[in-house]
Regions:
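A structural signal for small-residue-enriched, beta-sheet-centric alpha/beta enzyme cores
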Residues: 1-88, 97-408
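Generic structural marker for isolated residues within well-ordered, non-membrane alpha-helices
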Residues: 93
Length: 408
């Protein structure tokens, strides 16, 4: 059974973290370092955007099966920076390796922030040196790392669980994530930004990468704040095996626990979308294929009209059906059922392709359901057995303001 506990990336055995101010940002913490006492099996998902940031290019090329440290800077994405950007990413790895006595190949690197600006490596080098001396474990270390990777995020995004595996081994999983804008990840293994670090003391092999892809596809890859996939999206799972026990690649208890952590992180990213006031959850069932279910979910959560309606608690369900029709997926309108859920209210809207209600009083009930911090849109296509769930947020005035003023 998965047990949620108070913790973050240093909760599993053997992990230490630091977050410091290097000067890339004016005041905030802006450089983070994660370290494992032993080399850890690394499973990594990267953005599938064709315009990839320098750190993503470097890590994809190296494709290391083991990592012992990850260095992250915020305030500068190191994207669209040409050869110099590649050299800067490599230098971040090298400086970190020298400070910790590691091989640079066992150091991961991530960046987030403004695109198209060169790194101030004097400040970054200073930050890495300082962070390497401040590595420790515990909640303050987790909090410092979480703060150091934030950009337009308004909250730290952390999660930790413990679970007993099938062989009796007690293992821990910790996670930290950032993401608020430019969020519509489509991360692939071996292929405003979502960066996530997941740590575990479970024993995993490099073959777990295939399962890691499936978990990403059902969690972070089902999040969309604005439909824009970042140049820097990266998600790193580190498993150092310090809990002992058998290889947990095929352990259903571990898979369930990791999937729980990633789903929780995904929901938190969506809820903290830039300017957001509401979390939107979209569940599609009865689809003919998995691809159709996923496409339908993404079409709904990416629709500016749907997002605006949720913001205003406007029961204009025609916008949801418009989005369904625009998805390109085939279905019979006569089979579709639509329900909106908010708080303890679950209101049928459409049945067999026709509205369940027409009177003003019923419309007000729908409005009340939508006037909650979390609104669920439930769509049953009635044609198959495939399902998908995704998360987004409402579109507010503040989203436009934040992005209009971002670089200033």
């Amino acid at each position: 059974m998965v047990e949620v506990i108070d913790g973050g990336v240093t909760t599993p055995q053997g992990f230490k973290a630091a977050g410091v101010h290097s000067g890339v940002k004016y005041r905030s913490l802006d450089l983070a370092l994660l370290y494992s006492e032993t080399p850890a099996t690394a499973c990594v998902g990267y953005t599938s955007n064709n315009v990839k940031a320098a750190p993503v290019q470097v890590m994809m090329k190296e494709n290391a099966e083991k990592l012992q440290a990850v260095v992250i800077n915020s305030g500068n994405a190191n994207a669209l920076t040409g050869r110099r950007g590649i050299e800067d990413a490599l230098e971040m790895k090298k400086v970190t390796a020298n400070e910790l006595g590691l091989d640079p190949l066992n150091v991961g690197v991530m960046s987030t922030g403004l695109i198209g600006r060169f790194m101030d490596m004097h400040k970054v080098r200073y930050g890495i040196s300082r962070a390497s001396r401040e590595l420790f474990n515990g909640r303050q270390a987790d909090a410092n790392l979480a703060e150091a990777i934030m950009t337009t995020d308004t909250i730290k995004k952390e999660c930790a669980v413990r679970v007993r595996l099938s062989d009796g081994t007690l293992v821990y999983i910790g996670a930290i994530c950032k993401g608020s804008g430019m969020i519509s990840p489509h991360m692939k293994v071996l292929h405003g930004t979502t960066l996530s670090l997941i740590t575990t003391d479970a024993n995993l092999s490099p073959a777990f990468r295939e399962k890691w892809q499936r978990i990403l596809d059902g969690s972070l890859n089902m999040v969309s704040v604005d439909g824009d996939q970042s140049t820097n999206d990266t998600s790193i799972l580190l498993a150092n095996g310090m809990a002992g026990g058998k290889v947990a690649d095929d352990d259903p208890e571990f898979y369930e626990a990791l999937n729980f952590v990633m789903t929780k992180i995904a929901r938190t990213v969506a809820a903290d979308g830039e300017g957001a006031t509401k979390l939107i959850e979209v569940k599609v069932s009865g689809a003919d294929t998995k691809d159709d279910a996923v496409k339908l979910v993404k079409t709904i959560i990416n629709s500016p009209l749907v997002k605006s309606a949720i913001f205003g608690s406007d029961p204009n369900y025609g916008r949801i059906m418009m989005a369904l029709g625009n998805s390109g997926c085939k279905f019979n309108l006569e089979d579709v059922r639509l329900t909106i859920k908010g708080g303890d209210m679950e209101v049928p809207i459409l049945d067999s392709g026709a509205p369940v209600f027409q009177d003003e009083r019923s419309v007000e009930v729908v409005r009340m359901a939508m006037d909650n911090k979390e609104v669920s849109i439930l769509v049953d296509l009635g044609v198959g057995n495939e399902t998908a769930t995704g998360w987004g947020c409402d579109l507010t005035y503040d989203y436009v303001r934040i992005n209009a003023e971002y670089s200033t």
